[in-house]
């Protein structure tokens, strides 16, 4: 019995160090539910990139999801963002025709990395929403400038 406890403890320690950082991305954020619930549905486009793919951008983690013509998913995403907004350090919103169409949340840094949630919704038909989560050591204003820079 003691031997099996030692083995279990040893395995737990290995797993704790072996779990990649990406598994912790979005930890304790409600938006993770959006990616989990809708990420593999038909007609949804989800992209997740980690350090290797993001070297030129100075991001350590990038995840996005685009959902079209699903009012339930849009409402659910807005609810999740509203909950994550409670812990945000900075909040920026764009209002169009009396309706919030874009949201930028600067979350409290985790370790030495800044975290951003970006949301954009098209109110025209077909309705479409984009949700992006980014982790980076880069200053959040620089991240925003890079994302919004026109090519």
What are the roles of these predicted feature ranges?
Residues 74, 128, 142:
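Short acidic, gly/pro-rich beta-turn/loop elements at beta-sheet edges
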Residues 20, 24-26, 57-58, 85-92, ...:
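Charged, low-complexity, helix/coiled-coil-prone segments
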Residues 139-151:
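Short, low-complexity, Pro/Ser/Thr/Gly-rich segments in the mature regions of secreted, periplasmic
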Residues 64-114:
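Mature extracytoplasmic domains of secretory-pathway proteins
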